[in-house]
């Protein structure tokens, strides 16, 4: 039996603590100085960056080549909420695939899919480890976050495929061109995760109408089907599409990072998670960090977070414009709906439904429908200082949780994701019946995301490296002198790397593992802070030459589309 009153054994996985830190068991001596990295944001990008920085350090890639006593790394993640709460990532649809809306393959889509799947599998193992089967009581389990969770949720992610119906005639033309008229298996060399097939209306109806027509007591509305001839004429199916419970994934990813840091404590690795809202880049820059990575979504455009010149630099390097988008999604809950196991037939699982309106069955009994969105103005570099800002609270204000809002979202769901409602014959007349109703709504979720400039190949997240080093004024060595305030201070410049991951948009789940790898590699390349020494002002002039002579650079690590 566990002793719950033992306060000496602190649970490092308790999300209720403000700071969670994993470090070596010995007291660090003064001769060992870690690379100190701050990451602002605990969404897909922020946690992926933290994980990859720690992984690289465990392989010795952050150890200085100039001084053997300067090794190890400390990663501190700052977030206003616990991992899995707040921000766009925590309410992401969780639809993992590597195809554009017209069926073509996204650049770096296959490798992004593979890297994300690898992290998902690790996080699933972490979650399984943290569930104590002896504590299962009446369908609930006690998990690492200290909360009671429903066992019926199933696994964190499921490979059920993703279906993209054509919703317009233009969609149908593009899908036929990219999928039907392309021999995807011409040489029999297509990788399993790349498999895609063209589907006709009949197969789409099997997936979209199967449950609605079972036990609903009515025939389909023929007139409604005629109206949907174009919308449901064809589509494509991504064989290895995955639906992910984004909130659970983020929770487990944070614990995976803690495990990784603890496992590599001998390499002088430590990790801290601080529940704290960072008000500005300057606030963090004035602390003792050697590198700063901003992965804070729309917060980066909040008034005062960046100074005007840095904000202009962000816009220019991110492609010229950024757009904030506030939105809401319905979280649906319904038994025996998204997964069915009938005695007479095999198990059936609804695939993820792609499109401008999506449906993601992220648990056995839960799905997310969305997004209903409101785009902010596209902001150009010259207007960067006046950039508008959407917070989650602003999204809630724009889209209040009212009966009118719920009714609107239900109409969108029943009309745009599902074909027209069934018609039920009553004794007096025909009565329309929608598949989903207000009783199926669990909650309304809100979020804000940042979109970048659209290119012919689509939108891509951006990794921005800022140019300006941080200047600090150190105390005089003679501060102990009675007249120390009259003595000249030593002004020096600590060259800090500041990176920002922005414009993640709707591609966070697909690309976040790759983004984390690139950010970690960028922190290693041109290791200006490798020896952690204070650099004299005049030495900063030589930084450009040092970068030009480096074998690896930010430009060679991060592909052009992502910078």
Show which residues each predicted segment covers:
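Helical element adjacent to the flavin cofactor pocket in flavoenzyme catalytic cores
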Residues: 233-279, 284-285, 289-291, 295-296
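Glycine-rich FAD pyrophosphate-binding loop
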Residues: 54-89
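Beta1/beta-strand and adjacent pyrophosphate-binding region of the FAD-binding site
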Residues: 29-45
């Amino acid at each position: 039996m566990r002793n719950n009153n033992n306060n000496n054994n602190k649970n490092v996985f308790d999300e209720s603590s403000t700071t969670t830190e994993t470090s070596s068991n010995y007291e660090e001596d003064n001769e060992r100085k870690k690379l100190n990295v701050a990451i602002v944001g605990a969404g897909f990008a922020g946690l992926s960056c933290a994980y990859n920085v720690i992984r690289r350090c465990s392989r010795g890639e952050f150890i200085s080549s100039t001084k053997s006593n300067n090794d190890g790394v400390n990663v501190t993640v700052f977030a206003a909420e616990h991992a899995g709460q707040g921000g766009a990532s925590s309410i992401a649809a969780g639809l993992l695939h590597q195809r554009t809306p017209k069926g073509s393959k996204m650049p770096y889509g296959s490798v992004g899919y593979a890297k994300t799947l690898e992290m998902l599998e690790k996080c699933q193992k972490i979650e399984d480890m943290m569930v104590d089967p002896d504590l299962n009581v009446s369908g609930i389990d006690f998990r690492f976050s200290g909360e009671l969770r429903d066992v019926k949720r199933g696994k964190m992610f499921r490979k059920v495929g993703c279906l993209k119906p054509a919703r317009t005639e233009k969609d149908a033309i593009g899908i036929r061109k990219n999928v039907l008229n392309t021999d995807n298996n011409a040489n029999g060399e297509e990788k399993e995760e790349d498999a895609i097939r063209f589907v006709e209306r009949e197969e789409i109806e099997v997936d979209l109408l199967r449950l609605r027509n079972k036990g609903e007591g009515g025939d389909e509305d023929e007139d409604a089907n005629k109206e949907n001839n174009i919308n449901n004429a064809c589509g494509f199916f991504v064989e290895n599409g995955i639906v992910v419970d984004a909130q659970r994934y983020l929770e487990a990813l944070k614990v995976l990072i803690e495990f990784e840091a603890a496992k590599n404590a001998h390499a002088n690795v430590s990790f801290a998670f601080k529940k704290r809202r960072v008000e500005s880049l300057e606030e963090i820059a004035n602390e003792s960090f050697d590198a700063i990575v901003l992965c804070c979504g729309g917060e980066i455009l909040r008034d005062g977070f960046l100074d005007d010149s840095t904000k202009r630099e962000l816009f220019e390097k991110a492609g010229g414009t950024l757009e904030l988008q506030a939105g809401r999604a319905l979280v649906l809950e319904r038994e025996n709906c998204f997964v069915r196991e009938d005695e007479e037939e095999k198990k059936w699982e609804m695939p993820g439904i792609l499109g401008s309106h999506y449906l993601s069955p992220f648990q056995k009994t839960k799905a997310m429908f969305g997004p209903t969105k409101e785009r902010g103005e596209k902001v150009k570099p010259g207007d960067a200082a006046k950039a508008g800002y959407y917070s989650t609270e602003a999204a809630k204000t724009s889209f209040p949780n009212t009966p009118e809002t719920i009714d609107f979202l239900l109409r969108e769901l029943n009309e745009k994701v599902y074909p027209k409602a069934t018609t039920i014959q009553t004794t007096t007349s025909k009565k329309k019946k929608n598949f989903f109703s207000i009783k199926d709504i669990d909650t309304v979720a809100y979020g804000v995301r940042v979109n970048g400039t659209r290119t012919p190949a689509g939108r891509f997240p951006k990794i921005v490296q800022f140019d300006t080093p941080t200047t600090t004024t150190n105390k005089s060595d003679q501060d102990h002198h009675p007249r120390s305030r009259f003595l000249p201070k030593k002004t020096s410049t600590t060259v800090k790397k500041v990176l920002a991951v922005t414009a993640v948009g709707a591609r966070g789940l697909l690309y976040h593992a790759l983004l984390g790898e690139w950010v970690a590699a960028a922190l290693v390349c041109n290791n200006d802070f490798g020896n952690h020494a204070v650099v004299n002002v005049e030495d900063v002039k030589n930084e450009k030459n040092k970068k030009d002579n480096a074998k690896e650079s930010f430009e060679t690590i991060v592909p052009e589309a992502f910078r």
